[in-house]
Design a protein with these regions (language model features):
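Bacterial N-terminal signal peptides that target proteins for export
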Residues: 1-9
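N-terminal secretory/targeting leader peptides
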Residues: 10, 22-119, 128, 136-329
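Bacterial Sec-type N-terminal signal peptides, specifically the leucine/valine-rich hydrophobic h-region
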Residues: 16-19
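Thiol/selenol-based redox catalytic cores and closely related redox-interacting motifs
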Residues: 133
Length: 329
């Protein structure tokens, strides 16, 4: 009888321990939120879903990430602020709004900083880029990887731009940014801040003569219909950063941190491939529509670059060595 009671007690204890273990194991699962302001079929959003999928696979389902696309959780600035106090866990944002929180990122937005895309990726995928990712720590953020957003070019409705003097007097729509407004003014044009949604009608009615953006944006909002001159000056390449809240990051084990970083790099690789494909499709569509596409001769591009001296003095102050290092890559 005693043996039977002992056996029964042991069985109950074992069952209890097993159930407790199951509860603890179940409690370990983390459900996190990823904010993305672009549409579901956009390269950055597709990369976000890939990131979530990879993390879930490599953690055997312990970490599940829900992606909220289309700006459901707020605009980029609001999302960054929510990451800082842990209300949102992951995001991808342009370094333009991010530079409001980390001023050193302005360096990466300086006009005509890079010769081409290859140089930018040598910088961002190397030790310089790693330092910028790590610099987010003091803002309660952790930088994970770099996404592509292409090169921004000028376009207008008046004339093809082949030399610096062609910029003179053009009313160019810009984002409400001191750097962007200063850049346009330094090139001899008139900087006109305007809401993005008003640009098409502004071009159509002549309130503005031109604007600036990358191939997919020029195509997707049909600005090529009312501003048919597009110059490949590539004045800025503004990369985007994939981030995690430091409050969330500190909850991960070292092995999970390694997984998160690995998945971030893989998703960034996918985003860059998708972006390149999207650029190609947009360029083909714009060219087929009969737009005039021009490029700057090397000597002329040097004049555009030289005109940026005031911008470098203002926004690069204190970071001269970093800028020289970037340009030497």
């Amino acid at each position: 009888m005693k043996k039977t009671l002992v056996a029964a007690t042991c069985a109950l204890l074992a069952t209890g321990l097993a159930l407790t273990g199951c509860k603890e194991k179940k409690a370990e699962k983390m459900v996190l939120r990823y904010a993305e302001n672009q549409a579901q079929d956009y390269p950055t959003t597709k990369a976000a879903y890939k990131f979530a999928e990879l993390v879930e696979q490599k953690t055997n389902g312990r970490i599940h990430i829900d992606v909220y696309h289309g700006g459901q959780l707020g605009d980029e600035k609001a999302v960054i602020e929510q990451l800082q106090f842990g209300a949102i866990d992951f995001t991808r944002v342009s370094i333009s709004p991010l530079s409001e929180f980390e001023k050193s990122l302005n360096i990466l937005q300086l006009p005509y900083l890079y010769k081409d895309a290859a140089q930018m990726w040598r910088v961002l995928d190397g030790s310089i880029g790693e330092k910028f990712l790590n610099s987010m720590d003091k803002n309660n953020l952790v930088g994970l990887s770099w996404f592509d957003a292409g090169a921004r070019n000028f376009y207008d409705s008046k004339r093809p731009i082949t030399k610096l003097s062609d910029m003179k007097g053009l009313k160019i729509r810009v984002q409400e940014s001191q750097l962007m407004m200063g850049m346009v003014a330094a090139l001899g044009a008139s900087a006109t801040p305007m809401a993005y949604g008003e640009v098409y009608s502004g071009l159509q009615t002549g309130v503005i003569d031109g604007a600036e953006n990358n191939w997919p944006s020029y195509d997707s909002v049909s600005h090529y219909e009312v501003a048919k001159y597009y110059v490949l000056d590539e004045h800025t390449r503004v990369p985007e950063m994939q981030l995690v809240s430091k409050l969330t990051w500190d909850k991960f084990s070292d092995s999970d941190k390694a997984i998160i970083k690995e998945c971030a790099k893989e998703s960034a690789k996918l985003e860059r491939e998708l972006w390149a494909a999207k650029e190609k499709v947009s360029e083909e569509k714009v060219r087929a529509a009969g737009c005039t596409i021009t490029e700057l001769e090397p000597g002329e591009k040097e004049k555009f670059q030289a005109a940026m001296a005031p911008m470098y003095a203002q926004f690069g102050a204190g970071y001269e060595d970093v800028i020289k290092n970037i340009q030497a890559q």
